[in-house]
């Protein structure tokens, strides 16, 4: 599969660092952001092969990020994977089902991250 450029967006530092460290060990170029606004800025600056994004975050949540990306960077939509504990919540469940964006539910395993990278990066290259 090779080295991928991956963005990790999560307001929880421990989660963000866990994902980033696991992906770096696999040899990937990893960038991080602690909210959707910072993530959107990075999406505007770099071409990412994959974006792991939390849903519930301050300043700009994952749903607002998705809507901005859909409008301004539609080519990135097929590269997003939501990593969230909110997959079945009343707030985000209907949104997730309507987008068809892949979801990894928290708590997750490193194997789930590896599988997502393998599947998503293979589709976008």
Task: Tell what function each PLM region has.
Residues 57:
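Receiver (REC) domain active-site loop signature in two-component systems and cognate sites
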Residues 54:
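Active-site residues of response regulator receiver
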Residues 17-25:
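Charged docking surfaces used in two-component/phosphorelay signaling
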Residues 44-46, 60, 69-78, 96-98:
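Conserved phosphotransfer cores of two-component systems
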Residues 81-84:
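Hydrophobic/aromatic residues positioned on beta-strands within the core alpha/beta folds
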Residues 34-38, 61-65:
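Acidic catalytic/metal-coordinating carboxylates
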Residues 99, 108-117:
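C-terminal output helix
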Residues 27-34, 42:
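Short hydrophobic/Thr-rich beta-strand motif most characteristic of the beta2 strand and flanking loop
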């Amino acid at each position: 599969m090779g080295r991928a450029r991956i963005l990790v967006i999560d307001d929880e530092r421990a989660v963000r660092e866990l994902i980033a460290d696991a992906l770096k060990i696999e040899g990937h170029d990893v960038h991080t952001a602690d909210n959707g606004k910072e993530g959107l800025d990075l999406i505007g600056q770099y071409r990412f092969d994959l974006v792991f994004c939390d849903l519930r975050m301050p300043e700009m949540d994952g749903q607002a990020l998705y809507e901005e990306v859909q409008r301004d960077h539609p080519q990135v939509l097929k590269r997003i994977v939501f990593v969230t504990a909110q997959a079945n919540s009343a707030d985000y469940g209907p949104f997730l089902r309507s987008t068809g964006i892949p979801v990894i539910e928290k708590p997750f395993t490193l194997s789930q991250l590896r599988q997502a990278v393998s599947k998503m990066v293979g589709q976008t290259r």
